[in-house]
Amino acid sequence: MMLKTVLRLPVCAALLALAAGCAMIPPEPVVTGPLTAPPPPPPQPSARPNGSIYQPSAYGNYPLFEDRRPRNVGDIVTIVLEEKTNAAKGVATNTSRDGSATLGVAAAPRFMDGVINDKLDTDISGGNTANGTGKSSANNTFTGTITTTVIGVLPNGNLQIAGEKQIAINRGSEYVRFSGVVDPRSITGSNTVSSTRVADARIEYRSKGVMDEVQTMGWLQRFFLIASPF
């Protein structure tokens, strides 16, 4: 009885390891790193007198005639998502090969009479033909808006931006993540910039919940899909 129990333990452990290997693997995120960068607390400035027309306290850190476009860590930038890609590819391959050979023997040994009729003529021919075609196409469209935060300023003045938007509806949730590098001169007066003008742009749109689970193949199906040789 003890021997049977000892033998069953490795089998159970192997089955558990196999089931764990077939478990659902979460997708790797496209956008990595911090998604927001709260600015450090500014030093306490000395009290400034307020005039009768212009009051500095009402404008925060922005002077009266300063451009309001983002330039510091912690400023926000609205990204207008305008991504559209179309790709198509076609491949065709045709190959053929023919060959032939003839072998003749004028006379054969007497003990083989009646079998090959005193003469051996052999013709060999062969052919090989292969045809292959393939086509692939992809169309993607992604539109919307997301407000990001400046998380860093490069030495040349370009801004590193990143942001995330999460939406939870009933039992499911969706999130959009964005990161990249933008030139401050590309930002419009309304504090927006098109995603097509962002360098090193990384856009991630995923969902969690019932709809995501429905679109995922079960672990047992994945096991048979991997183990099946066909």
UniProtKB/Swiss-Prot annotation:
It is a lipid-anchor. A lipid is attached at C22 (N-palmitoyl cysteine). One of its GO terms (biological process) is bacterial-type flagellum-dependent cell motility. One of its GO terms (molecular function) is cytoskeletal motor activity. Residues 36-46 have a biased composition (Pro residues). Keywords: Bacterial flagellum, Cell outer membrane, Lipoprotein, Membrane, Palmitate, Signal. Residues 34-53 are annotated as: Disordered. It is found in: Cell outer membrane; Bacterial flagellum basal body. Pfam families: FlgH. Disulfide bonds: none annotated. A lipid is attached at C22 (S-diacylglycerol cysteine). Residues 1-21 form the signal peptide. It comes from the Bacteria. One of its GO terms (cellular component) is cell outer membrane. NCBIfam families: PRK12700.1 (NF009340). Assembles around the rod to form the L-ring and probably protects the motor/basal body from shearing forces during rotation. Belongs to the FlgH family. The basal body constitutes a major portion of the flagellar organelle and consists of four rings (L,P,S, and M) mounted on a central rod. This is Flagellar L-ring protein. The lineage of its organism: Bacteria, Pseudomonadati, Pseudomonadota, Betaproteobacteria, Burkholderiales. The gene is flgH.
